[in-house]
Amino acid sequence: MVSRFEHPAGGYKKIFETAEELNEPLPATVTGRIPSFIKGSLLRLGPGLFEAGAEPFYHLFDGQALMHKFDFSNGQVTYFRKFVKTDAYVRAITEKRVVITEFGTCAYPDPCKNIFSRFFSYFKGVEVTDNCLVNVYPIGEDFYAVTETNYITKVNVDTLETLKKVDMCNYVNINGVTAHPHIERDGTVYNIGNCMGKGASLAYNIVRIPPTQKDKSDPIEKSKVVVQFPSAERFKPSYVHSFGMTENYFVFVETPVKINLLKFLSAWSIRGSNYMDCFESDEEKGTWIHIARKHPGEYIDYKFRTSAMGLFHHINCYEDSGFIVFDLCAWKGFEFVYNYLWLANLRANWEEVKRNAMIAPQPEVRRYVIPLDPFREEQGKNLISLPYTTATATMRADGTIWLEPEVLFSGPRQAFEFPQINYRMVNGKNYTYAYGLGLNHFVPDRICKLNVRTKETWVWQEPDSYPSEPLFVQTPDGVDEDDGILMTIVVSPGAQRPTYCLILNAKDLSEIARAEVEILTPVTFHGMYKP
């Protein structure tokens, strides 16, 4: 799964450039044969505006949200894109400057205001961004573009028009929700975010949003908290990007990357600052793993711990013979990986990109196993008896259960990230295959498949081509777990038609078809296939 290619020409820089939205869809040139069951839309989100007037955005997660869509109908394909008209975007375009502080870019008061107006503008409270550039997913019959704050944005996925801004704080005790919910077959949505818990301490709430209502009312209005996880530190919640869910349990990994709440609140009231300034990490704090029963929502007060790591994406999580098995795209050590995702780093020449990545945390795919009955064995003995994994769990004298992982994949500066599975068939179940985007020193340059049982890998890769997260679509009559296709948007800057939707056979990553358009697209993070 290690990349075969170097990138001295620096074509990857093109995926970090501003794009214009389209007034109408562009027809795509199709090579190969689009599978007959693909009759829907591939929806993707990512940054598309990397400066406001003369003011640049500095971090990968600052660019304003651009929504992309490839439409498929009877073998014909079109491409369309529009900016999500968030408050952050509209005000940046209107005022030609950064108006709302983003992840790594600080907004300053309007220079046209007098000194007294500028002074008092610091004391109006925190203005949280609604820049929903990370993902899109359904809630009931509607679709929402999302980031990781309390705001989600309702969009029309047919026209890509922006419909409504929704503040989740109006419905549940939550400071923000992740862009990676779990969605059950009936449409029930589960998500996680930090909140103010008991005793004026920070905590983490699992939120449940019910499926489509019979009376067609908005399911968000019936959102509720189902269980709460405590925070290891009272005023420093961990950064949370995703969580695990089995049929009967929630799994939450609390990493040593913390948000300093006092620093966060003072950042806007005292001095110009951004979200990145409020993170801190400490290797000695290690990583805590929490579990809770799903029905009823009940926190299980076992003290599972492991060494410090960074974490963004869970791959899958399932129960087996009294154990919970969960697979992660981990990053070794305590340092925050986002420290290496400044646009200046990502746009650097190839040799500099490699030098920056060499000092960053090392990525690897890990499997951890949690014993649901950790007190059945004596102290110091391995509690894991599953025959197919080398992951261990041991009880320590202080009552904590120490977890050591099995490494499923590790390559030098070669990440398996943005993981996908056959979600409908195997989410929350024992499974075999994961699909991911391969990062070569943080440059996305291949699509990967991993057999988590045998550690066998497959790779799709072409020179000077930069794909996105692969989305799995199951064949309608598919029986095997990998009966289906992968869909990814690839940017090949030197080509006549530099962007294409690539369709791969999920069995062996062989190409089935591609739909090319004569336009460049910037990087995208996550998305979905809407049948």
UniProtKB/Swiss-Prot annotation:
GO biological process: retinal metabolic process; retinoid metabolic process; visual perception; zeaxanthin biosynthetic process
Cofactor note: Binds 1 Fe(2+) ion per subunit.
UniProt tissue specificity: Retinal pigment epithelium-specific.
The record's account of how the chain is modified after translation: Palmitoylated.
Primary localisation category: cytoplasm
Family matches, as Pfam families: RPE65
Membrane-topology descriptor: Lipid-anchor
Keyword Transferase: no
Family annotation (InterPro entries): Carotenoid_Oase
Cofactor list: Fe(2+)
Domain of life: Eukaryota
EC number: 3.1.1.64, 5.3.3.22
Lipidation sites (S-palmitoyl cysteine): C112, C329
One cellular component (GO) term of this entry: plasma membrane
Binding-site residues, Fe cation: H180, H241, H313, H526
Keywords: Cell membrane, Cytoplasm, Hydrolase, Iron, Isomerase, Lipoprotein, Membrane, Metal-binding, Palmitate, Sensory transduction, Vision
UniProt family annotation: Belongs to the carotenoid oxygenase family.
Function text: Plays important roles in the production of 11-cis retinal and in visual pigment regeneration. Capable of catalyzing the isomerization of lutein to meso-zeaxanthin an eye-specific carotenoid.
The protein, known as: Retinoid isomerohydrolase
Organism of origin: Danio rerio
